[in-house]
Amino acid sequence: MKGKKPSIEIATSNPSLPEDLVVSCLARVSRLYYPTLSLVSKSFRSLIASPDLYKTRSLLGRTESCLYLCLRYSPEDNPRWFTLCRKPNRRTLSKEKNESSGNLLVPIPIINSPPLEWSSIVAVGSHLYAINGPIEDAPCSNVSFLDCRSHTWLEAPSMRVAHTNSQLDGKMYLAGSSENVDSLNCIQVFSTKTQTWKPVPFQKRIFGVGDLEGKIYTICRTECGQGVTIKPKDLTCDVVGFCGEKDWSSVCMIGNIVYFYRPNGEFLWIYSGKGESARRNLKGLEGLPKFDDYASVKLVDYGGKLMVLWDTYVPESESKEKMIWCAEISLQKKCNNEEIWGTVEWFDAVLTVPEDCKFVRAIAATV
């Protein structure tokens, strides 16, 4: 009688990969998939929020724009934040009718989220800086920032002078409201690297050419629709006409070009230079649906592309809901830069919200 063959035990355990290898792999994945990957395990959630991951992404040249949408749900005091997420089974481009693009806005847990007291929010790298608005009609100098890597709100140093408006160009430039507005001393500069504020120096406000670059655009929300550009290099100002536009909620700047949407359905762009400005229609946009007259429309600089968000009410909805839609549009200059054409890469309904939910801000950070 033959003896039984000895049983062979097969190891089924799956040893963990070294953490640095996992980080290297995750750094090569688009951040659009991170909200889904964070659901895999607690360790994945920890890695996706780790500074090492984003350092690796930067070293590998894998940083990308990340869309954030801030909404206000009545009667809540604190806003809710959402980010664009892509389903893992998303196809390259949805060309079939009624086929979803696979893009969604998903809620993100925000730690220490402040109430909606800020009047402006600007993106500098992976941080979103919220500049507090007036409290009981008094200018406020408080500044908070959202770290888009860990989704945590932190406090930045307070401004030396309370502000009225803000723009940025690598650094943030804020027009103060507590000093002589005719003096350039009311302009403050915030270095996001050193986390310090400084005014434009007093003696004719002369400073190093290497410290400040480009232009600062400040829009005056008046019927004349005028704005001012400040050139830190030359210490000169130009008045820019914006053709009498009053609604600046649907506007963004990409490079040196201002894009805006008008309620009549037009997308326009303005190039400003040498004291002159020209307004032209954004051409192309084939396939982009017509927005409702009542729609709230937001434009975002999405890494050089134009991201458009708008809302539509859900017909015959018993729960009184509305849909938020999103479109990604690539831009191309033609005819010696006299024309700009937009190509709709995708558009889709990305979120369902109560109909009394309000747009607060749409913005993109680089992570």
UniProtKB/Swiss-Prot annotation:
Kelch repeat ranges per the UniProt record: 127-171, 172-216
InterPro entries: F-box-like_dom_sf, F-box/kelch-repeat_ARATH, F-box_dom, Kelch-typ_b-propeller
Entries under Gene3D superfamilies matching the protein: Kelch-type beta propeller (2.120.10.80)
Keywords: Kelch repeat, Repeat
Domain F-box residue range list: 11-57
Record's keyword annotation contains Repeat: yes
Pfam families reported for this sequence: F-box, Kelch_FKB95
Entry protein name: Putative F-box/kelch-repeat protein At4g39600
Organism, scientific name: Arabidopsis thaliana
